[in-house]
C-alpha cells in the first residue's frame, strides 16, 4: 500500500525499530487526518485513548498502537458518522469488517505490510456511542502529517489530558492490560502542570455515569492482583519505542503515589502472606 521508500523516509520521524510498526504508524497518522478532515466526523467524534495521549500530548510516543479510539460526542444515530468515516478511509484502506455491539461500533481494516517479512496488519477504529459528555470540555489540537506518501493536517477534537487519564485510570481497573499502567506513569512523568486531582475527579465522574463506585482499597487490591499476572506485565515490552523501558514496580509506585492514594476510602491492607513488590 505504501511505497517502501516512503516507509523508509518515515523511519526518521518515528521511534520504532520494526518496519511493520513504522508502516502502521504512518497509516494511523493519515487515518487521523482523514477522519478529522471530514466536516461531519470532525464535529461528531472526539479522539481519546492511549493513541490520543501518545500522538497529541507527548513530544515523541512511548509505545506503539494499532487502534484509533473515538467517542460520539452528540446523541443521535451513528449511521451518518460511520458513513463519514468510511468515506475517508475506504478509498485507500479498502472495505472494512465491522461490528456493532452495545455502546460501540468497531471497524477492522486489514492489509499486509510492504516490507519483508510480509506481516498481516490491521487498523482498528472504534467508536464509543454512549458517552455523550465531557467533564473538562473538549480541546482542539492541530495534527499534521508530512510524508512523500501523504501530506495533510486536521483540527482534532479531543479531551484535556486530565480527562484522558481519568478514562485511562478507569481502563486500568476494568481490563487486564499493562499498557494502561505504562501510559499513566509516562503521562505523570512527562506532562508538566498535570492536575492530579482533576484526573481523579474525572475518573470518579465517569464511574458515576456508569452507576459505579470504586474505593481506594478496591482499586489497590485489583492492581495488586494484576501485577502478579504475567499476561498483564508482558503486555508492554513488545510495544515500547526505542530507548524506552518499562518497570512495572516503578510504574505502580508512581501511579499509587500520584493518583491512587487520592481515591476515597481507606488504603488496602495487604495480606500478610502476599509477597510485596519491590
Please place each PLM-identified region on the residue numbering:
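Glycine-rich beta-strand-to-loop/alpha-helix junction loops that act as flexible
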Residues: 47-52
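Structured mid-to-C-terminal alpha-helical surface segments
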Residues: 1-45, 56-64, 68, 72-278
Amino acid at each position: 500500500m505504501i511505497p517502501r521508500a516512503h516507509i523508509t523516509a518515515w523511519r526518521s520521524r518515528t521511534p520504532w525499530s520494526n518496519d511493520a510498526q513504522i508502516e502502521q504508524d504512518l497509516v494511523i497518522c493519515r487515518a487521523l487526518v482523514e477522519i478529522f478532515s471530514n466536516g461531519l466526523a470532525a464535529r461528531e467524534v472526539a479522539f481519546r485513548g492511549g493513541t490520543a495521549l501518545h500522538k497529541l500530548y507527548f513530544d515523541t510516543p512511548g509505545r506503539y498502537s494499532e487502534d484509533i479510539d473515538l467517542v460520539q460526542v452528540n446523541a443521535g444515530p451513528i449511521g451518518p458518522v460511520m458513513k463519514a468515516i468510511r468515506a475517508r478511509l475506504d478509498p485507500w484502506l479498502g472495505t472494512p469488517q465491522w461490528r456493532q455491539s452495545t455502546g460501540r461500533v468497531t471497524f477492522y481494516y486489514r492489509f499486509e505490510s510492504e516490507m519483508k517479512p510480509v506481516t498481516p496488519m490491521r487498523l482498528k477504529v472504534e467508536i464509543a456511542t454512549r458517552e455523550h459528555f465531557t467533564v473538562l470540555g473538549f480541546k482542539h489540537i492541530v495534527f499534521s502529517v508530512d510524508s512523500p506518501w501523504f501530506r495533510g493536517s486536521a483540527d482534532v477534537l479531543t479531551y484535556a489530558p486530565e480527562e484522558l487519564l481519568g478514562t485511562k485510570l478507569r481502563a486500568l481497573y476494568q481490563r487486564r492490560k499493562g499498557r494502561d499502567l505504562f501510559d499513566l506513569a509516562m503521562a505523570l512523568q512527562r506532562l508538566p502542570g498535570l492536575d492530579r486531582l482533576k484526573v481523579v475527579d474525572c475518573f470518579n465522574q465517569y464511574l458515576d455515569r456508569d452507576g459505579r463506585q470504586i474505593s481506594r482499597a478496591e482499586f489497590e487490591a485489583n492492581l495488586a492482583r494484576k501485577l502478579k499476572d504475567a499476561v498483564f506485565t508482558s503486555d508492554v515490552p513488545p510495544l515500547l519505542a526505542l530507548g524506552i523501558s518499562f518497570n512495572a514496580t516503578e510504574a505502580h509506585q508512581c501511579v499509587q503515589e500520584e493518583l491512587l492514594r487520592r481515591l476515597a476510602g481507606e488504603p488496602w491492607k495487604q495480606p500478610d502472606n502476599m509477597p510485596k513488590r519491590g
